């Protein structure tokens, strides 16, 4: 598949409260919504019930992973997206689902990790149990993001990484699958 082409249309939430609901996807260069099969495998690994967990979707793009987490009961989902049009589409999808546990942050992922954008009433620590790290391909952003994540993670947090190049996993990280 040529990921450099624009992707537009819709994708479906595959499980949980919002199952079968459509998420509109903006036509943006490099936007790669995570395919159904990959999301299904990922959420089989994470578990179907994410109740009580805080999730961070860096480089949210279509929001497929963050909305899937919200659908499966995550108490808080923060989606960070730099692209103005993609972030606006995330807001429209959040409103259409009435996903009040989802917060959209339009901004740079590295800046988000460096500052505290948390909304009032969120966990004071601003830490996350699950992080989805799926930056645009050919940006080699994964190593830098992994270096900035530890202060924002709960003990035993899980980080899902999607990359177009192999990622070296070094301490304090452990590769699970």
Which stretches of residues belong to each language-model region?
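Class I S-adenosyl-L-methionine-dependent methyltransferase catalytic core
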Residues: 1-177
